[in-house]
Structure formats: structure tokens, C-alpha cells
């Protein structure tokens, strides 16, 4: 069940069920001739909460999200990466380094959608509520307002209150609830707009 597609590396990256794939057309017939499983083991607790919404960041990283009932255990060259419940993923494709943030639903109970602005700042959306989040502050590890010393401990502390993942809480709201986020802008706009 495909829930995200992003062009890159001479083909397309695909969020497909419990896997992240790379598909490539090598003979020009517009069909994938090569399929590579980059990672598998993403949570499959509910079909509308699988890994989704993949996007490139300006540094080449791939960003994607997962929903509330996903309990992911992904084997990478850097070890097993665990991420429970709604969360945001970052993959550095050249190194195959996979990192998870906001486990335990710290920033919305059903993350769906990632967008990056002209300055490389990452934002994500929660499909279970009208809130959107500035992702970067919540990625800072090594302590939290609850006194936790790790992201995992912090996720347990924040389970009952996802808006507290970072002191700024939700950055914006959309009405009605949506499952996507996009940043509208262009370098061609005058600065005063």
C-alpha cells in the first residue's frame, strides 16, 4: 500500500506498507526494472498510519512520517532503530543512517505530511487534529522540560499531551483537519510579502 513517492537517485523512493523502496527504470519504458528494499520493519498497526509523505530536505535527507499505531523496528547498518507510535523519520541516504523523532505521539497522534521551507527548516502535520508543527526544536535531544534525559523517556512523559513536545507546541492550525502540509512561497516574491 503506497503512501508516499519522491523522485531521487535516478528513480523514485516509495513508502510501501512496512518498507521503504527505491524503484528505477533502466530501459526507458516507464516501468520499474529495478526494485531495491532500502529498509523494512516499519510499523503496520493500521493501514492509514503506515510510513507516508516522503520529501527531500535541502541536504539530501529524506523525511517521512508514521501514524499512531505504528511500532517500527528497522534494522540499519547503524543498528536497530525503534520508533513507537506517531513520529517523524529522517534518512540520510548516502550513509543509510535512519533516525526517528517524536516517538510516542509527542507531536500529534497521527503524523502525516512533511514540508521544508526555503531555509531548510522542517515542518510536519498531524492528521488527527488541525495542528501543524515546526519540527526542528523537537529534534533536540538530551533533555526536556519534564527532566527526561533522552528522547525515549521524553516520549513517555508527553504521551498524554502531544502539544508539549516542545515549549512552542503547535505552530499553526488548519481547518478542517488535513493530512498534508505544504509551504507556499518562492524566491521571486518581494521580501515584504
Regions found by a protein language model. Name each.
Residues 1-193:
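Beta-propeller blade termini and top-face loops
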Amino acid at each position: 500500500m503506497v503512501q508516499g513517492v519522491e523522485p531521487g537517485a535516478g528513480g523514485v523512493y516509495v513508502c510501501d506498507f512496512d518498507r521503504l523502496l527505491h524503484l528505477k527504470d533502466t530501459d526507458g519504458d516507464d516501468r520499474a526494472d529495478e526494485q531495491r528494499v532500502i529498509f523494512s520493519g516499519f510499523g503496520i498497526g493500521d493501514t492509514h498510519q503506515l510510513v507516508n509523505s516522503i520529501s527531500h530536505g535541502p541536504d539530501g535527507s529524506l523525511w517521512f512520517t508514521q501514524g499512531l499505531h505504528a511500532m517500527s523496528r528497522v534494522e540499519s547498518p547503524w543498528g536497530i532503530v525503534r520508533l513507537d507510535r506517531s513520529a517523524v523519520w529522517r534518512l540520510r541516504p548516502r550513509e543509510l543512517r535512519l533516525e526517528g523523532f517524536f516517538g510516542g505521539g509527542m507531536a500529534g497522534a497521527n503524523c502525516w505530511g512533511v514540508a521544508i521551507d526555503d531555509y531548510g527548516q522542517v515542518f510536519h502535520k498531524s492528521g488527527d487534529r488541525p495542528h501543524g508543527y515546526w519540527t526542528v526544536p523537537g529534534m533536540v535531544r538530551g533533555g526536556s522540560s519534564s527532566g527526561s534525559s533522552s528522547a525515549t523517556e521524553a516520549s513517555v512523559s508527553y504521551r498524554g499531551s502531544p502539544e508539549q513536545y516542545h515549549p512552542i507546541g503547535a505552530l499553526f492550525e488548519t481547518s478542517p483537519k488535513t493530512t498534508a502540509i505544504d509551504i507556499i512561497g518562492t524566491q521571486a516574491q518581494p521580501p515584504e510579502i
